[in-house]
Each structure stands twice: as C-alpha cells, then as structure tokens.
Amino acid sequence: NTLVYDYDQPASFWGGNEYLNFDTKDMRAATAAIQEVRLEDIYEHYLYPNTPRNNKPYTYFPDVNGDFIPRTLQGALPEREGDYTWVHFSLKPNGKGNSETYIYVLGKFNNYTPSPEYLMTYNATQKMYQARILFKQGFYNYSYALSPVLYETGFSDTSLENETYLDENGIDGNFHFTENQYQILVYFKGFLDQHQRLVGIGSANSMNINDQ
C-alpha cells in the first residue's frame, strides 16, 4: 500500500520577508539601525524611520527569524546586568495615514501578540506611525502587522477571532526568497481515538528544503 500526501495548495502559506532589527548592546552608542540616543530617566533609542517594503524588490537581510538575544557591553551577564531602554519606532506610510488602521510591532519578544503596549499611533504632524516600547538590552528582530480591529487585551479578546484579523505581510511584503526556519508537528488520530496524538516532530530551513 502507498500513502499519498497531496495537500500542497491548502497547506501553502506566505513566505513573508526578512525581519528588521536593532541592537542596544551599547546603551550610549547608536548602531546601524539607531538614529539617536538620549538619556532621560533611562536611555531612549530612536530608530531610523522605516517605510513599507511590500512594493520594493527583495533584499537579503540576515536575521534570526524573529528572535531576540539579550546582550550588553556593560556587563558579563546580560540576563542579569542588562539595562532597560525605551525604543522609539516610526513607520512612514506610502500614502496618507489612516487612523482606522491599526499597526502593531511584533516579534518573539512579545510572542507575536498584538496588545496596547505594542500599538503604533499616527502622528499627523510628522506623518508617521510611532510607538515607544520598553526593551531589555540586546539584539531584536521585529516586524509590522496590520489589523482592521483594535486588540485591547491581545489574543485574549473573546470578541475577536485571534490572529485572523492580523495581516503580517501587508507592510513588509512576501517573497519566495525569504529565509525561514520551520518547525513541523505531525499529528495522528485513529478511528477509535478521541484525541489526536503527536507522532512526529522536526525542523527545517527554507534554504535547504526540497520536494523529495
């Protein structure tokens, strides 16, 4: 007997784009993505304004697939000795900003969960969406996600269908060149089983996956 798996089209999903990043390992210095550093009550890091990438050609931009790495030059143990800093994000839309479109900053640092502290607000004077978010020192990947609805308590909002409303590619775009790390979980449910069973687990990188 032969078991044929032919579920390619329904199981397909968008490839996304490489993540954006910033690095605050040195609190007093502006790295490649940081435009300005200020010292108020604590350090404030202002990132260079971003623009949507969904209408631009793909550019290879090495990332850590949405992850983050705590690190500091001011101590040997970043998990304990790293400080906190306010990071300022700004996104310049292609057209006129829309106060009824909600944009969130997402990454593994917040488990990709939209909630009020990661919501951007539109600054009509500067014509940009802006957000001010508290981070521990380190290297972070992040991306922008669009939503037509406002998440007041993250995915715990019972009135919303969770991530169904999130468009994670509307700003950053989709490219088949994008390098991604995937984790595969295989479940099985027998005829007499009441629950599905996890029977296999694996991981693969899009750079070395083939159809064999």
Locate predicted features.
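Aromatic-rich carbohydrate-binding modules that target alpha-glucans
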Residues: 1, 86-137, 149-183, 189
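Long, internal scaffold/assembly segments composed of regular secondary structure
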Residues: 1-59
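Sparse, context-dependent recognition of short Cys/His-centered cofactor- or disulfide-binding micro-motifs
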Residues: 7, 72-76, 118, 129
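A general structural signal for short secondary-structure junctions and capping/turn motifs
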Residues: 10-13, 79, 133-134
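Active-site-adjacent segment of 2-oxoglutarate/Fe(II) JmjC oxygenases
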Residues: 13-18, 169-207
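Basic K/R-rich, polyanion-interacting modules in nucleoproteins and related proteins
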Residues: 44-99, 185, 198-212
